[in-house]
Every structure is written in C-alpha cells, then in structure tokens.
Amino acid sequence: ELERSRGNKDIDWIVVCMHQTAVSTGNKTNGADLGIRENWLPLFDRFNVDLVVCGHEHHYERSHAIRGTLPTDTLTPNPVDAQPDSIDTSKGTVHLVIGGGGTSIPSNTMLFPEPRCRVLMSVGELNPATGRKTPNYIEEAAPWSVFRDRENPCGFVAFDVDPGRPGASTTMDATYYAVSGPFGEVRAVDRFRLTRPRTDR
C-alpha cells in the first residue's frame, strides 16, 4: 500500500496511523517498541512517509523529522531536520503521539524530566502472579524529541492541508489543542507546518 501510494502522482501526503509507538519519552509507561523500529521505520524511510500518528501512550509529543537510525542497540531514530516548527517531510518522517483523547490513566505526568526514552527490547517469561510476560527495557537518549506536553492530560490535533499549485509545494498545518477544566476549555499548545514538493512537479 505504501509503495502504491508513493507511486501515485495524485497523492502527495502519506500519513500512517498505528497504535504502538517508535518514539516516546514516557517513563514507567509502555515506551517505544524495538520491533516497530526494526520492521516499520525502514518502510517509512523507503516510501517517504510524511507523518506517523500513534496512540498507546496517553500524552502528546512530537518528533523532529527522522530518517534512518543511529548505531545503537535500540536503533535510536536519527533526527535529520532541526527546524522545530517548519518541517520538510521530504527529508524525514515526523512522529506524533496523540494519546490524550480521553483516558483514566494519563501519562503526561510520567514523562522523563529530560528527553529520554525507554525502548521495549523483548519480553521474558510469563509471570504467573500478573498473567503477563515481563518486559525488558533499555533506556536511551531521545535526540529526536522536539515537543512534549507535560501539563495537559487531554487534547487533540487539527490538520489543515493546502494542496498548493501544480509544480510547487503543498503544506499541512497542525495545531495541538489541550482540553482542560470542567467546561472543556480549549487552548492551542503546539503548532507546526509540514511541507513537501507536490508529486506533479
């Protein structure tokens, strides 16, 4: 599907929606998943995926554009564009964790103080007391991290796409709105713009 979409001149943007994450700065939460980094990130690079939207973690955070991985056991995603708010996705894929749509267990207060990441490397034997397999984690630095909402447990992202003109670029403006208070006060907390050349160039 990714190959067909990227080869279609009528499609500019490729957005992947999935549950678990390749990136997360949550501590004592689910964390990032090595299996996703091994199996999915190379596909996202190969087919120039623009944006990956995940849940699983119950907070909001955003990565720099990433392409490839650093030479670590955890396959740390490699940030390729230091621009925090205007990102050319032809250089790399931006990852969003949007997990604050409504949960009884928010994780925004469980983020590492500095950008770090726990990566699920494998699972061990079944623990009869819990009925679950024991997860094995490795902690790493998170150079890919650009924005984390530590204050607000609930929120959503609105996207506005401008197709642009033939032969030029197309843009996707995104705004993360935090929702708080007993009356659902909505406040913009993070804004960024993705750009890419149109495929009809």
Regions found by a protein language model. Name each.
Residues E1-V16, T21-N30, L34, E38, ...:
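Metal-dependent phosphoesterase/phosphodiesterase active-site architecture
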